């Protein structure tokens, strides 16, 4: 397989434009910032641009002056940034705050079945009883694995694994190997039963990021690796000629969506050179989707589990979104990192 080909200077410049535009947005302690800042942290790891640390630190420090707000699964996503800041600054306040969030997840967050987290959001008026959403893997599942490793807390780590296994059990179709957006445990169905693009982006990206945290001799490694392997095999067969994926993966009449594509393309890179030809096409398309001012375009708005396919098709995609910025940064950072590691 051919090596991934790219202009390192161009990719670095595009990353910088995205980061700068991201910090012209206003964020609360919620998932738009959580995903955006995850991407900024990844951008730092790839570029070592110290400005990115300062931007994140300034935002978090200002928020922490008021203490933690009431938490939800979506709000826990900021925990990724706290772990990053603890790593690069050594300041224990970030880890202590992240631990508070992990305690919320472990002991207070609503669950159902075999300990699967119910997806919860910051807005109290929106409640989804006993629903599992693929989004939770990014907001809380991966976070629990990461903090479990950092703090050597097996209970946190095992809960992270529980989320990956539980969400696979209820969301991954055993025939298509794609992930549904959500599962309703009360109704015992997948609601509208849609293979939503960003849901598959969340699942693929987080599994790819989870595997390096798990010992290869741990049974969970094989379970997650198998789920990801089969999902990626299905996803590459649905990639559009443009290099992007549709917001409804198996519906070519639905629009092409960039945040899902970035998450999927990043996950494809975890397989080394196996999927280089697909990643190469995605790279060109995602770079093209970044406006001159750093806005990542063609990113769908925050999406509840819609009632039908038409509902997903009507979700707007004209505005800047934190998750679009963050997922594009994550992908482009992974592209740059191929210069620093064995890619085979």
Curated annotation (Swiss-Prot):
Its EC number is 3.2.1.172. It catalyses: 2-O-(4-deoxy-beta-L-threo-hex-4-enopyranuronosyl)-alpha-L-rhamnose + H2O = 5-dehydro-4-deoxy-D-glucuronate + L-rhamnopyranose. It holds the Pfam family Glyco_hydro_88. Optimum pH is 6.0. One of its GO terms (cellular component) is cytoplasm. The keyword Cell membrane does not apply. Its main location: cytoplasm. Substrate binds at residues 30-31, 74, 118-128, 198-202, 308-309. It comes from the Bacteria. Disulfide bonds: none annotated. Keywords: Cytoplasm, Glycosidase, Hydrolase. One of its GO terms (molecular function) is unsaturated rhamnogalacturonyl hydrolase activity. GO terms for biological process: carbohydrate metabolic process. Monomer. Belongs to the glycosyl hydrolase 105 family. Catalyzes the hydrolysis of unsaturated rhamnogalacturonan disaccharide to yield unsaturated D-galacturonic acid and L-rhamnose. It cannot act on unsaturated glucuronyl hydrolase (UGL) substrates containing unsaturated D-glucuronic acid at the non-reducing terminus, although the active pockets of YesR and UGL are very similar. This is Unsaturated rhamnogalacturonyl hydrolase YesR. It comes from Bacillus subtilis (strain 168). The lineage of its organism: Bacteria, Bacillati, Bacillota, Bacilli, Bacillales. The gene is yesR.
């Amino acid at each position: 397989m051919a090596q991934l080909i790219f202009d390192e200077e161009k990719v670095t410049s595009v990353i910088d434009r995205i980061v700068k535009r991201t910090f012209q947005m206003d964020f609360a302690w919620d998932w738009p910032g959580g995903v955006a800042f995850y991407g900024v942290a990844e951008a730092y790891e790839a570029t070592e641009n110290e400005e990115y640390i300062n931007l994140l630190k300034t935002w978090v420090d200002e928020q922490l002056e008021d203490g933690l707000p009431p938490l939800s699964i979506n709000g826990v996503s900021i925990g990724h940034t706290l772990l990053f800041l603890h790593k690069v600054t050594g300041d224990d306040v970030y880890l202590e705050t992240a631990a508070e969030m992990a305690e919320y997840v472990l002991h207070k967050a609503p669950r159902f079945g075999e300990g699967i987290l119910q997806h919860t959001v910051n807005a109290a008026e929106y409640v989804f009883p006993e629903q599992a959403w693929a989004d939770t893997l990014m907001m809380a599942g991966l976070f629990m694995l990461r903090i479990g490793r950092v703090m050597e807390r097996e209970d946190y780590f095992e809960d992270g694994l529980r989320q990956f296994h539980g969400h696979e059990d209820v969301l991954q179709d055993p025939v298509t190997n794609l992930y549904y957006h959500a599962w309703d445990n009360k109704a015992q169905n997948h609601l509208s039963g849609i293979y939503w693009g960003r849901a598959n982006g969340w699942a693929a990206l987080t599994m790819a990021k989870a595997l390096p945290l798990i010992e290869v001799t741990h049974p969970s490694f094989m379970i997650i690796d198998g789920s990801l392997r089969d999902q990626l095999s299905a996803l590459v067969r649905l990639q559009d000629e443009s290099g992007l994926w549709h917001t409804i993966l198996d519906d070519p009449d639905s629009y092409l969506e960039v945040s899902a594509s970035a998450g999927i393309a990043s996950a494809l890179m975890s397989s080394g050179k196996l999927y280089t030809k697909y990643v190469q096409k995605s790279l060109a398309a995602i770079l093209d989707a970044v406006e001159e001012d750093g806005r990542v375009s063609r990113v769908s708005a925050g999406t509840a589990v819609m009632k039908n396919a038409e509902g997903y098709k009507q979700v707007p995609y004209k505005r800047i979104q934190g998750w679009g910025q963050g997922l594009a940064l994550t992908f482009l950072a992974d592209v740059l990192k191929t210069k620093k590691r064995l890619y085979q």
